[in-house]
Amino acid sequence: MARAAGARGPAGWCRRRGRCGRGTLLAFAAWTAGWVLAAALLLRAHPGVLSERCTDEKSRRILAALCQDYQGGTLAGDLCEDLCVAGELLFQRCLHYNRGKKVLQADWRGRPVVLKSKEEAFSSFPPLSLLEEEAGEGGQDMPEAELLLMVAGEVKSALGLELSNSSLGPWWPGRRGPRWRGQLASLWALLQQEEYVYFSLLQDLSPHVLPVLGSCGHFYAVEFLAAGSPHHRALFPLDRAPGAPGGGQAKAISDIALSFLDMVNHFDSDFSHRLHLCDIKPENFAIRSDFTVVAIDVDMAFFEPKMREILEQNCTGDEDCNFFDCFSRCDLRVNKCGAQRVNNNLQVICDKIFRHWFSAPLKSSAVSFQLQLQLQEAVQECADPGVPSGNTRRAASSVFWKLRQLLQATLRELQEAEK
């Protein structure tokens, strides 16, 4: 069997004939490149194929090691006592492992939460150099100014933003005490996780991101919300949507779509820099009971300065300038991608989410055919604007308001039908 397998393709033909021409070698190179490209595309489309198997047994071992480090004074956190001593933060099940990231479900005093970390072990994170260098018990003599400088530098590395000292409150380890060294080491591990930094920064500024509930070492806890999935008929679980069958779901979808629009406008306008979402798919969002959209995975979210830094790479064509859902254009005069993103969050949401809902008639006869047709056309225009890159922002603003008005009109028709 091994011999037969090895004889396949141009290389096998060469061995059988005993010679290879230049054309055959070129064909073999193309054949090999095709397989390499296919493998790369498979890994990009399905990164989970290289992920570890998510098991409850391994997850329990990970948390046991975390608690052992806590009891040894290596790490600290406001959830460590509940997890490791009081038994009030209880592991429930493994949700997923993905390229090192561990995501676990737990119960915290009767509340479902998610424990997250970019790495399995606390020792996987580089230590804070000041802790290694400073003499004195627990680094108690460490100058506060140096700490602030290092925290600000790590936040800038994660976000690409310069923050004032007064903005660093979410990441300050608190008063010095017997666990000060463990607190600093834990803070440093958390600051090396971009998602934690985003959630911490935005939790008091946005209803569309998860608040951080607490942490223990390198693991942090957020609210558990059921993620979307392409396996759901409506992308998100809407089984309990109020109202009559069909009409209730149509109303829920319209409410959720309006919340997506609110999130887009919020991320575009309400921070000092635009926030770009480069991995838009149902699995990265969840819906609250009031149909508010929440971004539950922001590993691929970037503020404008960081986005420009990521996009501005060498290129030989436009395809080299695509960073997941964030696209740029290749300037062939200098073989460099433009730093300006040429598509936008709304365009990708229309393409990957709204198309699923509005490309076919809504499951409710209460919405007029004309309104449904207008909504379909607006979603198509949004997903594929067909305008020069310099005009995309103006076009996005126009279609944003058009979609908003059509969705509000849809809700009015559904509400009238309920009377």
Swiss-Prot record:
Topological type in the membrane: Single-pass type II membrane protein
Provide the transmembrane region boundaries.
23-43
Q: Name one GO cellular component term.
A: endoplasmic reticulum membrane
- Locations listed in the record: Endoplasmic reticulum membrane
Read off the Pfam families from this record.
PIP49_C, PIP49_N
Q: Does the keyword Phosphoprotein apply?
A: no
Lumenal membrane side = 44-419
Q: How is it modified after translation?
A: Among the many cysteines in the lumenal domain, most are probably involved in disulfide bonds.
The stretches that face the Cytoplasmic side, renumbered to this chain, are 1-22
Keywords annotated in UniProt: Disulfide bond, Endoplasmic reticulum, Membrane, Signal-anchor, Transmembrane, Transmembrane helix
Where on this chain is May mediate ER retention (motif)? 16-17
Cited PANTHER family: DIVERGENT PROTEIN KINASE DOMAIN 1C, DIVERGENT PROTEIN KINASE DOMAIN 1C-RELATED
What the record says about family reads:
Belongs to the DIPK family.
Q: What is this protein called?
A: Divergent protein kinase domain 1C
| Name of the encoding gene | DIPK1C
